[in-house]
Amino acid sequence: MSESVHTNTSLWSKGMKAVIVAQFLSAFGDNALLFATLALLKAQFYPEWSQPILQMVFVGAYILFAPFVGQVADSFAKGRVMMFANGLKLLGAASICFGINPFLGYTLVGVGAAAYSPAKYGILGELTTGSKLVKANGLMEASTIAAILLGSVAGGVLADWHVLVALAACALAYGGAVVANIYIPKLAAARPGQSWNLINMTRSFLNACTSLWCNGETRFSLVGTSLFWGAGVTLRFLLVLWVPVALGITDNATPTYLNAMVAIGIVVGAGAAAKLVTLETVSRCMPAGILIGVVVLIFSLQHELLPAYALLMLIGVLGGFFVVPLNALLQERGKKSVGAGNAIAVQNLGENSAMLLMLGIYSLAVMVGIPVVPIGIGFGALFALAITALWIWQRRH
C-alpha cells in the first residue's frame, strides 16, 4: 500500500484513529507504571534519591538505542514497529509483576519506548502533512496528555489499594496497545534497504545529528523540546517529594492528582497552539516557555492544595502551547532532510540526554540534603533563564 494513499487524508481516518488509540493506551501504561513502580520502591524501602534513578535507567535506554531506532522506524512499516515496541513494554511490566528487579523491568520498558517514539511521531507525517501536521501533533499530544492524566491517577490510586493490581493494570494497557496497533494501515517503509551494519548505522545517525544541528530551525526545535521534556520529567519527581513537605500529605495518590492538573493544562495548550501557531509563526510559543519557569518558581512556595492545582494547570497550558509547534517544526523540516524516523530519534537523544542530566542533578541535590522547596525555586528560575537565552539566540539568527 503506497504512502501517498494515506497522505492528506482526514485527521479522523481509520489509520489516525488507530494511532491515537494505541498511543493513548501505551502512554497510559507508561504513566501508571511509573507511579506504581515508585510505590513499589517505597514499599520495599528504597532510599528517596533512588526514585529519579528509576527514570534515569528508562531514558538511558533511549540514549543507548538512539543511533538505531530511527532507522528501524524508517526501514519497516511504522505501525508494526509500534506493535513490537509495545510488546517489549508489556514484557517489562509483566516482569515487574512477577518479582523481577524493578529497575531491570523498567529498563526493558524503556527499550520498548525508545523503539516506539520515532515510529509514533514519524507515522503522522505519512498519514497527513503540511497544515494538517500541526493539528495531527495536537491530537497526538492531547491523546498523550489524556493518558498521562488518567494513567498517573490510576497508578497512584491503585497502588494505594494494592501495588500488584496497579502493575497488572499497566500490563493490560500495553496489551491493549498491541491490539490497537494491528489496525494501523501497513504503509510502505519510508527508507527500505538500508545497511544494518552497526558501525554504519552509528555513523549515519551521527550524520543525521550533524545535519539537524547545522540547520538553524531544527537546532532551535531540538534545544527547545529537550529543555521542556527534561524539565517536565524532573517536575514529576519534584512533586513526589514536595507534596509531603509543603502540603503534609503522604499518600501515593496526591502527587498523581497534581500531575493530572499539568496534563489537563497541556491538552488545552496543545489545542490552542494548533489553532494559533503555524510553522511560519513558531516563535509565538517562546513567551509561554519563559513563563513556565516563572510559574514553577511561584508554585514551589505554595502551602495550600487549591493554589497548587491552579498553578500546575497553568504550567500545563503554557507547556502545551510551547512544545507542540516545536515538535511540528522538527518533523516537517526533518522529514525533508534526514527522514522523519531519524529526526525523531535525534530529538529523543536530545530530550533524554536533557532528562538524564536534569534528573542526575536533582537526584544529587536530594542526596546531599538540599530541601525540596529551594530545589523547586532554583529549578524554575534556571528554566526561565534557559528559554530566554534560546529565544534571544533564535531572534538573532
Curated annotation (Swiss-Prot):
Keywords: Cell inner membrane, Cell membrane, Lipid transport, Membrane, Transmembrane, Transmembrane helix, Transport. It is a multi-pass membrane protein. GO terms for molecular function: lysophospholipid:sodium symporter activity. The keyword Cell membrane applies. Residues 39-52, 112-144, 188-226, 278-280, 326-343, 388-397 are cytoplasmic. GO terms for cellular component: plasma membrane. Catalyzes the facilitated diffusion of 2-acyl-glycero-3-phosphoethanolamine (2-acyl-GPE) into the cell. This is Lysophospholipid transporter LplT. The lineage of its organism: Bacteria, Pseudomonadati, Pseudomonadota, Gammaproteobacteria, Enterobacterales.
